């Protein structure tokens, strides 16, 4: 059986535009699908609008929201390093994946909607009848 290739798209926005309030990726919305894909042996690519490091919503790190799985990943230096080196959406826009997942967090409201590379990725996968999802579909 061929290995499935999954693209996990995460936000690069770490602050709300008009107020002094931090945001970013909601950690558990990433760790759960990441863990499931990793356990199944999928090839995982993590990308963000600009590439590079991504902010984590500090509220998602509070004990009330940080479940055991997410806490274990957050405490793993290799996992944290991976989050510091995401590919840019432009880098991966020409590739086809079996599944594209848009991870949540309020930051995504600001850098996903108008991102042309992300729009092209979603349209291309839709046109090819491949799967796309966002955190609300979990």
Q: Which residue stretches match the model-derived regions?
A:
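Conserved small/polar residues in nucleotide/adenosyl-binding loops
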Residues: 131-138
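Extended, subdomain-level signal for the structured scaffold at the beginning of enzyme domains
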Residues: 1-127
């Amino acid at each position: 059986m061929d290995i499935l290739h999954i693209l996990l798209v995460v936000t690069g926005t770490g602050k709300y535009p008009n107020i002094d309030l931090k945001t970013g990726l909601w950690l558990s919305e990433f760790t759960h699908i990441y863990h499931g894909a990793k356990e199944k042996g999928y090839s995982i690519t993590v990308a963000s609008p600009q590439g590079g490091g991504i902010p984590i919503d500090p509220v998602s790190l509070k004990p009330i929201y940080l479940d055991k799985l997410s806490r274990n990943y957050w405490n793993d230096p290799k996992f944290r390093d991976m989050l510091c080196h995401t590919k840019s959406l432009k880098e991966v826009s020409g590739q086809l994946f079996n599944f594209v997942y848009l991870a949540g967090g309020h930051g995504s409201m600001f850098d996903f909607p108008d991102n042309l590379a992300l729009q092209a990725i979603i349209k291309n996968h839709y046109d090819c009848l491949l799967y796309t999802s966002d955190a609300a579909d979990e």
